[in-house]
Amino acid sequence: FKAIRNTDYAGNFDDFLDAVEKEAPFCFWLGTSEPHRAYENGAGKRTGKDPAKVIVPSIFPDNAIVRSDILDYYVEVEHFDLMVQRAIASLEKRGHLDNTIVVVTSDHGMPFPRAKASLYDWGSRVPLAIRWPRGIRNPGRDVKDFVHLSDLAPTFIEAAGADVPSMMTASSLMKIFSGQKMNDRDAAYIAMERHDGCREGGKGYPCRAVRTQDYLYIYNFEPGRWPSGSPDPRVCARSIPFGEIDTSPTKSFMMESRMEHGIAHLAELSFGMRPAEELYDLKKDPEQLANVAGLIEYSAIQHARRRQLFDHLKKTHDPRVVGGKVEW
């Protein structure tokens, strides 16, 4: 595939394991470029994937361009899967697999409009699969508790038998590994400052969110700034309009068709300005298309989620809340 790098990530892991002394502890991060953009146009269909079987998220128009773009994305995800498969096989061949914590995850959501570089589910919810036969009871469980990727740091520290520093605000997953139900894992707290420098002065778009089972509440600290980057490509480090969103066939189509009926609303959600507060009722609106902040019937929920978020930000000493005037 033209867009997939020729880096042999799994082969690099093999070389690393060859250099590790016998019985010595090790840590390795296998980070691939895939599925970062750009993709080979038409790669998905070329591998026999059927566009008709694609489940198109409601945040995108449903047409042949978008379906093909998603299939091309799948090709690169499968390449990552292949590298992970080979790495796991290497651990098994060397007898390390059962005593190694294997974590498979991602740093953000899919590189599409209103996904990556946003606090909506398509931007912040990522896969997380953990394998550790000697440390996880009842393996194969589908755990519904909210976790953060920052929880991995105290988890690794505790698994190694060391004390977790009190300054860490994240929580170890070891109790989940042991099968305990965690009553305090009923929400996820999400933060973003910027992706690329795509606004005047290189400024970001600071926002914070709390995600519960039923609601997503977002607070945008600078609603006067363009959330997806300025429409003026001259102020973007990548010289593209709305540069927080990676260039793609989906983005191009939505920009070119943003005045058309049925697409204008989706384009506004992806590229337009956003209010200071956003609230989404996930039972009625799982893909977060209708902001109900400001509606009378949701005022109590909005107030409660705002207080929940800001209590957490104060507790964790977020500089946007406790640091005085912030210049960036």
Language-model segments: residues:
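Basic phosphate/pyrophosphate-binding loop/patch that engages nucleotide-derived ligands
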Residues: 21, 178-183
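Short, acidic/polar N-cap/turn motifs at the starts of alpha helices
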Residues: 206-207
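Short hydrophobic-aromatic micro-motifs
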Residues: 211, 216-219
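Extracellular glycoside hydrolase catalytic/binding regions
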Residues: 5-6, 188-198
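Short, flexible loop/turn segments with low-complexity composition
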Residues: 170, 318-328
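CheY-like receiver
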Residues: 12, 16-19, 176
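Active-site-proximal cap/lid insertion segments
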Residues: 1-4, 17-168, 203, 216, ...
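Polar, glycine-rich mid-to-C-terminal structural blocks
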Residues: 171-176, 184-193, 203
